[in-house]
């Protein structure tokens, strides 16, 4: 997605050869117009897949997931990383390690919001080692729901997350695929479209 790549080039900050900071438009301050375009793009890519729910993880996955849900006309469920007094019944849980925060979290979704009748699109802001995606896959499977695919806003293709998910048979659609963050510069994977 060219608009997203331009935004990354203009506003993204390479903190190391492993970490890209995009807090000016995605995971702290949010650019609503860009999120709308991201939602439109995911909706276009999954329009014929019979999606009934979108599942994401708080907090940075929520904006692109909501915009996609708006376009597809389906509800969005987000996994919580923190305990809540209201989230107690029929919990679907998974452990997720955050590459950026270097911490492990227990994520949870109320089972009342997912069922074996759902066909789910998983959306997240980043894909690095795939831990968040694997956690969300686990939660969706616990509900007995099926998975249409995984939509990623920014993929770090030099890390193993995508390959692992594809090997497991999941369709992964990433809007910006980063090949490298070496020498303080963002290099994108050159995609060949037929």
Curated annotation (Swiss-Prot):
<keyword id="KW-0808">Transferase</keyword>
<dbReference type="GO" id="GO:0046110">
    <property type="term" value="P:xanthine metabolic process"/>
</dbReference>
<feature type="binding site">
    <location>
        <position position="156"/>
    </location>
    <ligand>
        <name>xanthine</name>
    </ligand>
</feature>
<dbReference type="InterPro" id="IPR050118">
    <property type="entry name" value="Pur/Pyrimidine_PRTase"/>
</dbReference>
<dbReference type="InterPro" id="IPR000836">
    <property type="entry name" value="PRibTrfase_dom"/>
</dbReference>
<dbReference type="Pfam" id="PF00156">
    <property type="entry name" value="Pribosyltran"/>
</dbReference>
<dbReference type="GO" id="GO:0005737">
    <property type="term" value="C:cytoplasm"/>
</dbReference>
<comment type="subunit">
    <text>Homodimer.</text>
</comment>
<comment type="function">
    <text>Converts the preformed base xanthine, a product of nucleic acid breakdown, to xanthosine 5'-monophosphate (XMP), so that it can be reused for RNA or DNA synthesis.</text>
</comment>
<comment type="similarity">
    <text>Belongs to the purine/pyrimidine phosphoribosyltransferase family. Xpt subfamily.</text>
</comment>
<dbReference type="InterPro" id="IPR029057">
    <property type="entry name" value="PRTase-like"/>
</dbReference>
<keyword id="KW-0328">Glycosyltransferase</keyword>
<protein>
    <recommendedName>
        <fullName>Xanthine phosphoribosyltransferase</fullName>
        <ecNumber>2.4.2.22</ecNumber>
    </recommendedName>
</protein>
<feature type="binding site">
    <location>
        <begin position="128"/>
        <end position="132"/>
    </location>
    <ligand>
        <name>5-phospho-alpha-D-ribose 1-diphosphate</name>
    </ligand>
</feature>
<dbReference type="GO" id="GO:0032265">
    <property type="term" value="P:XMP salvage"/>
</dbReference>
<dbReference type="InterPro" id="IPR010079">
    <property type="entry name" value="Xanthine_PRibTrfase"/>
</dbReference>
<dbReference type="GO" id="GO:0006166">
    <property type="term" value="P:purine ribonucleoside salvage"/>
</dbReference>
<keyword id="KW-0963">Cytoplasm</keyword>
<comment type="pathway">
    <text>Purine metabolism; XMP biosynthesis via salvage pathway; XMP from xanthine: step 1/1.</text>
</comment>
<feature type="binding site">
    <location>
        <position position="20"/>
    </location>
    <ligand>
        <name>xanthine</name>
    </ligand>
</feature>
<feature type="binding site">
    <location>
        <position position="27"/>
    </location>
    <ligand>
        <name>xanthine</name>
    </ligand>
</feature>
<dbReference type="GO" id="GO:0000310">
    <property type="term" value="F:xanthine phosphoribosyltransferase activity"/>
</dbReference>
<keyword id="KW-0660">Purine salvage</keyword>
